[in-house]
């Protein structure tokens, strides 16, 4: 646990919690770490979980795969981020799956153990609950943003909506996106070939430049 202590302190879930309170809080959360290989399923869709996942290293994709194998990428979680918190809190079956995008280390935390009242009324407990609510709110905003992109009528409009949002997020017109081509197509729920054709059309129309996952938006 000691080698991960700095990563835990830096995670948004534990922001503002006194370092002296962390060991006891982690014990209450029954914190357990495990490493996963690229492509390995961390939490399968359709099962229940009483634990959220905290990404200690690497990255995780939150995905939905339908009966025919079509994939919808819901989110990409990197170091310090959490996933499955809604399902851990409610006890509902997972409607998405969590898959290791790269080799990663995941710490499972039984967050339900601290959702009730704390007998010691400790500040760390209250802060953790507040941080969890903030993370849930942030995830909701990100999901609404994804719905906004997907709600556009054409592949071209979906691309422009997503890239515009990324430019606004970075604060400049030149930026990197976190997805490769297939992942971006899965995130926007479009055909990869059609999306690639539209990217080339946008480039030819003088709207943007790109190389791999690096983009420059033009006026």
Language model regions located:
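Glycine- and acidic-residue-biased ligand/ion/polar-headgroup-sensing regions
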Residues: 39, 50-63, 68, 79-80
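Cyclic nucleotide-binding regulatory module and flanking cytosolic helices
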Residues: 1-38, 87-89
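Cyclic-nucleotide recognition modules
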Residues: 29, 73-133
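Short, small/polar residue-rich loop motifs at catalytic or cofactor-binding pockets
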Residues: 28-29, 47-49
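Phosphate-/nucleic-acid-contacting segments
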Residues: 155-158, 162-219
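Short, Lys/Arg-enriched, Trp-marked, Pro/Gly-tolerant hinge/linker segments that flank
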Residues: 123, 143-155, 169-175
């Amino acid at each position: 646990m000691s080698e991960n202590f700095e990563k835990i302190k830096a995670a948004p879930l534990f922001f503002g919690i006194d370092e002296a309170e962390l060991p006891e809080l982690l014990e209450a959360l029954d914190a357990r770490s495990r490493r996963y290989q690229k492509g390995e399923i961390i939490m399968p869709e359709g099962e229940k979980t009483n634990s959220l996942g905290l990404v200690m290293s690497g990255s995780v994709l939150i995905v939905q795969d339908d009966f025919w194998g079509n994939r919808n990428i819901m989110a990409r979680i990197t170091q310090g981020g959490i996933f499955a918190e809604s399902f851990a809190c409610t006890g509902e079956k997972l409607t998405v799956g969590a898959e290791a995008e790269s080799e990663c280390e995941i710490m499972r935390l039984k967050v339900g153990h601290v959702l009730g009242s704390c007998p010691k009324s400790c500040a760390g407990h209250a802060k953790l609950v507040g941080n969890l609510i903030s993370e849930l709110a942030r995830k909701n905003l990100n999901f609404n943003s994804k719905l906004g992109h997907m709600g556009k009528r054409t592949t071209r409009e979906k691309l422009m909506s997503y890239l515009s949002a990324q430019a606004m997020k970075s604060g400049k017109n030149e930026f990197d996106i976190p997805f490769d081509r297939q992942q971006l197509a899965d995130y926007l729920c479009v055909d990869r070939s059609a999306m690639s054709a539209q990217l080339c059309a946008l480039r030819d129309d003088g709207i943007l430049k790109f190389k791999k996952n690096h983009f420059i938006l033009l006026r």
